[in-house]
Design a protein with these regions (language model features):
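Select subsegments of transmembrane alpha-helices in polytopic membrane proteins
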Residues: 65-70, 96-104
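Alpha-helical transmembrane segments of multi-pass integral membrane proteins
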Residues: 104-161
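Membrane-interface helix-boundary signature
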Residues: 2-9, 60-67, 88-92, 122-129
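N-terminal signal-anchor transmembrane alpha helix
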Residues: 4-29
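Cytoplasmic juxtamembrane regions at transmembrane-helix boundaries
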Residues: 77-102, 161
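Long, glycine/tryptophan/cysteine-rich extracytoplasmic
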Residues: 22-60
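Individual transmembrane alpha-helix segments
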Residues: 51-88
Length: 161
């Protein structure tokens, strides 16, 4: 199981996905013409106001269930997929779903950006953590390719016998 390179790719997806759960991916900043500078951060745990009078982070909005569910499913599916090493075709199908989920994360994120922009009237900026689903997508494609190569190798070995 661990000797296969796709397992390493899957473990990286799990580690990056767990990191994504706890890190903010967007910053919302009030426009320059506003009377007060306010900086919000958006992550899977919610929308947090970073700059306020007490300089203490304050959670403004919880219940971003779509973003939290998408973020939690990425490492969960990758972890389940590690233990399906004997069922390579099922593993490849799950990888395709995982790749779509990684791209779907950006769709869900776009919905929350649009809602926050309308509700708060702020400008948004991506934080480097926002690239994690894209990295997971690339790792998923690499793992899928290796899984399909393994399946072809096993079928070729069965024909030789």
């Amino acid at each position: 199981m661990i000797q296969r390179i796709q397992t390493v790719y899957l473990l990286l997806i799990v580690a990056l996905g767990i990191t994504l759960i706890f890190m903010p991916v967007l910053q919302f900043v009030t426009p320059e013409e506003a009377e007060e500078l306010r900086i919000y951060e958006l992550g899977a745990s919610g929308l947090t106001l970073i700059t306020n009078e007490d300089c203490q982070p304050e959670v403004c909005l919880q219940g971003l269930w779509g973003l939290l569910l998408t973020t939690a499913l990425i490492p969960a599916l990758a972890l389940v997929d590690i233990f399906l090493y004997r069922k390579r075709l099922l593993q490849a199908r799950l990888k395709i779903f995982l790749a779509l989920l990684c791209l779907g994360y950006y769709g869900v994120l776009a919905i929350y950006i649009w809602q926050a922009k309308l509700a708060l009237g702020v400008e948004w900026h991506l934080i480097p953590w926002a690239s994690i689903p894209l990295i997971c997508f690339v790792l998923t494609l690499m793992a899928t390719r290796r899984i399909l190569k393994d399946e072809a190798l096993v079928r070729a070995a069965d024909r030789i016998r």
